[in-house]
Curated annotation (Swiss-Prot):
Source species: Conus bullatus
Secretion signal, residue range per the UniProt entry: 1-24
Chain positions listed as propeptide in the UniProt record: 25-39, 71-76
Location(s), subcellular: Secreted
UniProt note on tissues of expression: Expressed by the venom duct.
Residue(s) carrying Arginine amide: R69
Coiled coil (residue ranges): none
Function per UniProt: Highly inhibits both nicotinic acetylcholine receptors (neuronal (alpha-3/beta-4) and muscular (alpha-1/beta-1/epsilon/delta) subtypes) and the voltage-gated potassium channel Kv1.6/KCNA6 subtype.
Keyword Lyase: no
Protein name as catalogued: Conotoxin Bu28
Length: 76
């Protein structure tokens, strides 16, 4: 595997793990507290990334989207 392929693989793996950590619907994933991110200033790049994520329906720990999806619970 070349160094470019290795770097790409690592970046994709990191991205998948990050999405798993912040996706609220995913079972058995870590949930970080939202109040910890409230003090972090948002730069233009993060603001753009958050607007794209919110438009796609993802609400992450870093991005606080105004439109939230409802929580669906199932009972067995």
């Amino acid at each position: 595997m070349t160094s470019v392929q290795s770097a790409t693989c690592c970046c994709l793996l990191w991205l998948v793990l990050c999405v798993q950590l912040v996706t609220p619907d995913s079972p058995a994933t870590a949930q970080l507290s939202r109040h910890l991110t409230a003090r972090v200033p948002v730069g233009p790049a993060l603001a753009y990334a958050c607007s794209v994520m919110c438009a796609k329906g993802y609400d992450t720990v870093v991005c606080t989207c105004t439109r939230r999806r409802g929580v669906v619970s199932s009972s067995i």
